Amino acid sequence: MILQPIDYVVDAWIVLAVLSAAYVAFDQFRGNPEATVMKWGFVLVTLYMGPIGVLLYVMADKEPSPGTHEAFVAPLWKQSVGSTVHCVAGDATGIILAAILTALLGLPMWADVLIEYVAGFAFGLFIFQALFMR
């Protein structure tokens, strides 16, 4: 197998994504007063988006100093980012897990699309909404 230049870019992006998610996880679970579902949401979205996810986290959720989280996330655009992250984390996780499963099973594209849609919806609703929102 011959490596192409894009392979190095992809490898670097994966490393950056893992490091970014590790930073967000450390910061979120070290004392952020955010709900657990949002902590996991930002970690997962950062894992999927890499450094762009860190940028979203720092701009929209990381409190500048202890005790300022509520005031920091009060602007509507930050609440919108939080809502989007919450939804994307649940739905995307279901879709990614379903895509892995359907690829391993070698299912046809129509089944792949259907299973990914159902899994994304179900994972978002039953895990990120019902389970984590308690």
Language-model-detected regions and their locations in the chain:
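Alpha-helical membrane segments of multi-pass proteins
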Residues: M1-R134
